[in-house]
């Protein structure tokens, strides 16, 4: 731990000063992605410097075979819930109120955005302008953000079913329901699940195992920042494949261990988040796993707009502060150059964002 972090957090609760109970740990003998036993230490003495909840210090290993990263040892499934005491999906997000008076400029932006959403995803938002579907193509950064909010899903036909795994407080399912999907979710965190249920969403408290009987049932399944949290990602993707109808779509969004941010900020990169992030993929390892399980038409999406937020959070962590602090932060000339002058390849983006289809028989 850096001296800066020691000094800054001296007046805060420092849960890492206590060890995670030894009887609540499990060892990881082989890579959870490719089953290789060959590995090197990527980072050690990692702490929960994101939410300041979890005790213990942790070691992140890099698999020599597939370049994925994983914790060993790690909290076992029975105890991992202790690391989620103040997780950000416990509360309900703000709802857009189109009745609020805004400036003419912001009203036009909203009309154009709503016009694009209505055309592309099937929402019925008002006020809306049909020009939105054309103007959106001229603003690639904003288009990326809008498409990722709706997870690149097709416009649904009647009675198409969507499942969100790890749905949190239901923010995305509210959007998908508005677009015409028949939505449901599963969420292991009772606090987050109850927040979603209070919004009238069908959410089961637990894991995907609750839905084992619904083979070939869903037209789309989404996993946004979920797969890095599970102990057995391969089994999760196999279960998703069974639940999807032939030709059904899966959407995945997860941190990228090969990103520029991971290289620049190292143990303070926001995407590590020990001990909640158990496995961190790179694009090649995730795509290889999907192909082996039975997915096709894998399409990596470009979400470069997320870089600045990740860099700012990581810089705050580097300074020993919470990534969600409101204090201003200086990124430094090199990071600013990365943001303003570079257009990173998809394998260097902060997140792996992709869609794939279950192979049709």
Where would I find each of the regions flagged by the language model?
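A C-terminal cap/extension of S-adenosyl-L-methionine-dependent methyltransferases
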Residues: 2-30, 41, 45-53, 299-361
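Conserved SAM-binding loop
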Residues: 3-8, 16-32, 38-39, 143-268, ...
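N-terminal juxtadomain amphipathic helix
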Residues: 5-110
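Non-catalytic surface loops within mature trypsin-like serine protease
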Residues: 65, 88, 256, 304, ...
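Extended interfacial segments that mediate partner engagement and assembly in macromolecular machines
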Residues: 67-179
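Short catalytic/ligand-binding loop motif for oxyanion handling, primarily in non-cytosolic enzymes
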Residues: 70-72, 80, 172-173, 192, ...
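Flexible, active-site-proximal loop/turn residues at the rims of small-molecule/cofactor binding pockets
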Residues: 72-75, 227, 256, 304
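Residue-level "edge-of-site" marker
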Residues: 76, 189, 209, 303-304
């Amino acid at each position: 731990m850096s001296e800066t972090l020691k000094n800054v957090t001296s007046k805060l609760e420092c849960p890492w000063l206590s060890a995670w109970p030894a009887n609540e740990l499990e060892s990881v003998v082989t890579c959870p992605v490719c089953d290789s036993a060959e590995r090197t230490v990527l980072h050690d003495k990692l702490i929960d410097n994101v939410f300041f909840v979890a005790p213990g210090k942790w070691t992140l290993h890099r698999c020599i075979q597939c370049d994925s990263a994983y914790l060993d040892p790690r909290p076992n499934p029975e105890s991992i819930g202790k690391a989620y005491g103040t997780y950000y999906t416990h509360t309900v997000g703000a709802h857009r109120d189109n009745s609020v008076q805004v400036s003419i400029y912001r009203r036009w932006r909203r009309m154009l955005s709503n016009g694009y959403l209505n055309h592309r995803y099937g929402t019925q938002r008002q006020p809306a302008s049909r020009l939105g579907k054309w103007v959106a193509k001229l603003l690639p950064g904003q288009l990326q953000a809008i498409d990722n909010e709706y997870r690149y899903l097709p416009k649904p036909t009647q009675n198409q079913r969507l499942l969100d795994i790890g749905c949190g407080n239901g923010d995305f399912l509210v959007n998908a329901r508005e677009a015409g999907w028949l939505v449901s979710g599963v969420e292991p965190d009772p606090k987050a699940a109850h927040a979603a249920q209070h919004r009238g969403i069908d959410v089961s408290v637990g894991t995907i195992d609750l839905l084992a009987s619904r083979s070939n049932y869903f037209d789309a399944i989404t996993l946004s920042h979920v797969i890095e949290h599970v102990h057995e990602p391969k089994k999760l993707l196999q279960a998703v494949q069974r639940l999807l109808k032939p030709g059904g779509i899966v959407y995945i969004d997860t941190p990228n261990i090969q990103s520029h941010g991971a290289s620049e900020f190292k143990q303070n990169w926001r995407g590590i988040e020990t001990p909640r992030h158990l496995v961190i993929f790179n694009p090649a390892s995730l795509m290889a796993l999907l192909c082996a399980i039975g997915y096709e038409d894998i399409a990596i999406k470009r979400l470069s707009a997320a870089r600045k937020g990740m860099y700012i959070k990581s810089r705050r962590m580097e300074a020993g502060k919470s990534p969600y602090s409101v204090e201003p932060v200086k990124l430094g000339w090199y990071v600013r150059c990365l943001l303003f002058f570079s257009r990173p390849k998809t394998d260097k983006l902060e997140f792996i964002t992709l869609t794939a289809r279950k192979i049709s028989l």
